[in-house]
Every structure is written in C-alpha cells, then in structure tokens.
Amino acid sequence: MKQIIFFAIILFFVSCKKNHTDTPYGLATYKDLNFTNYFKRTTGWVAGDGGFSVALNNGNSLWLWGDSHIGFYDPTTKSVPCLFQVRNAGLLMGINNPQNQTTLTGTSNPASYFYFGTNTNYWFWPGAGYQNGDTAYVFLSRLKANGGGTFGFTEVDSNYVAKIKIPEMSIVGYSILPPKNGIVFNNAVVKNGVYNYIYGIKSNGFGNDLFVARFPIANLYAAWEYYGTAGWSTNLSSLQKIHSEFTSSFNVCKIKNKYILITTEFSVACDQGKNIYSYTSDEPYGPFVNKKTVWTLDDQFQGHYPFFYLANAHPEYDNGNNELLITYCINEYGSCVNTCIEGRKDPNFYRPKAIRVPYKLIDTSL
C-alpha cells in the first residue's frame, strides 16, 4: 500500500544488492511481542496496513491506516473476511498506556475515516502528520480505481491535507496544496525548532529519490522552503534529492542529535526482500550514511516470507531503554501460500509487527 504499491509495477523487474553492516557486539533488535499484541484487536479496527503515528499533546497518538478490516472478526475461527471493509481508518492509542484505544471511522459508505465526495472509485490513503494547537494535520494521497487485483489503482494526486479537531478527533476540513513536481510529500514530518521538516519521494525508474522541504510549524500554508545544492529556497525548481534507494518505504525521525532514516529492502510479493535498514545524519537534509541492517523478517509461514513494506518509526513510544519502536506491515503471502480459505483469513497476515531497535545499533553515538 501507499507509495510502495504505487511504484511497485515500475520496480517489479529490477533487482538490487544487499548492503549489510556488522551488528555492534551485544546489541540486537528484537520483536516487541507486547506491542505487536496491541494490534491483535477483535472489535473496531482489526487489521490493516499503513501504521503512521502522530503524537498528540493529550497523551495519545493517532495511528493512521490504509485498507482496513473493521469488525467482522469471528472468535471461533479467529478469522476475518478476506476483503477489507474501508479504505482508511484511524486508531487513537495511549502513549503511556497503549491498551487505551479508540477506532476512528467515518459516516460514509464505506465508512472510511477520510473521505471526500461520494464517488467510491476515489479514496484516500493517509501518510504522515503533525499537531499544531488544537488541530492535527494529516497528509493524504488520493487514489482512483482502474481495474482489479493488487495494483488496480492509480494515484490522482498527493497534495491533500486533512484537518482534525483535537481532542474530538472529528475531521473539520480538507485542503489541497500546490503541486510539488510529482513528489509525494507524506513519508515523514519531523519537528525541529520553528519548522516542520517534511519528507517525500518520487520514482526515478529504478527506485525512488528522497526529498525534504520545510514550513513553519505555525503555518502549513506559508511558503515552503526546499532543500537543494545551494541550501534552502522557496523556489521549487531548486529542490534536489537527498537520498536514493531501490525501495518505496522511507521514514525519518529524530533521536537525540541524529536524524534517522528507515528504509526497507524491495518487496512486492512473497519471498522477496526481508531486511529493514537504518541510516543516520547530523542534519535533516542528510547526507544519510552509516547504513545498518537492523532487522531481518522472521514472519515465515509454511516456509515462505510475506510481502512487506512501510517500516515506520514511533519515537513517542519510549520504553526507557534507549530503543526505537519501529512497526512494519505485512500483506499476506501472495502466490506462495493461499491464505484466503472459504472467504476468510487469519487477520495476523495483515497486521503490523513491532520491533525494538537499540539506539546504539543505529549509531554508537546515541
């Protein structure tokens, strides 16, 4: 889903090299089973992909999902219908107590949280966001159906922003930003000083280029500044890529004095990429260096690995052990294993997984 699926057809026939870095002695990433279990819900939001989180100032974090299963969980078979019910959803989750959760959907049919208009051939997939004052802003991509199957859609535009009233969590409006030369700016938003730094990607034919822009935290609609070889400029044409990689999963966060870039190995089907990588930089615009393989998937089923994507960092969920929470999405096992049996499936094949990565595994200075 999100950009990983949108660019998947372009990337499908291309191969890439793995780049492994030795793990510092005594440091290891582990599957956070407790946090993974928070997503094993049986009512409301039950399963989905996406997994961007927006830390709010009321002790909660807004989790944002794409195609999602809402209800219809059978406790006897522990299964859900094979087809999801909504195109997007929200989940309000406590930061200190993640078991406190509230599903957020809308009143349309289907009851997606974000919707605009009545034509169900169009829908939103949410990306990153942030809060300012009593409003959360979420960056959205708008899609249109153009056929059946996993990739039966096309992106219409990526410049929509939803405004959400806090603490009511009601959507109070949508706006559309000026075009950004085909760059999808919704991979990450990082606050630093008076600015929000926003990251976006654009296909280069063999992967994606990563870009960064910034705008005042207090005013999303002020003139954006774009980073290029000459520094920051309000001229969009001055924008230059800050990183390139054979993937569509990019996420950035800040830990202490380092900017952390999280990417994934290329995967659009079963038994493809299995690795999650980290890079570090002293500046929001890179260069991102010090590549580490911080996790290799362990989600095998009948000897096969799933289609996986969207490794996102959630620094607000600090466990006090200098470990970064990262979630990643899996989307069943494709042609390798038939997981839809008599119209139902195990929701765990479409639920996010959580890992904890030691800061010093990412960078020994952290």
Annotated model-derived regions:
Residues 49-52, 111-130, 185-189, 248-251, ...:
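Beta-propeller and closely related beta-sheet repeat lectin domains
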Residues 1-4:
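Positively charged n-region of N-terminal signal peptides that target proteins for export
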Residues 52, 264, 305-329:
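C-terminal structured interaction module
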Residues 181-188, 195-198:
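Extended, non-transmembrane interaction/recognition domains
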Residues 19-44, 56-122, 131-180, 200-245, ...:
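Beta-rich carbohydrate-recognition and catalytic domains
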Residues 12-15:
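C-terminal motif of bacterial Sec signal peptides marking the signal peptidase cleavage site
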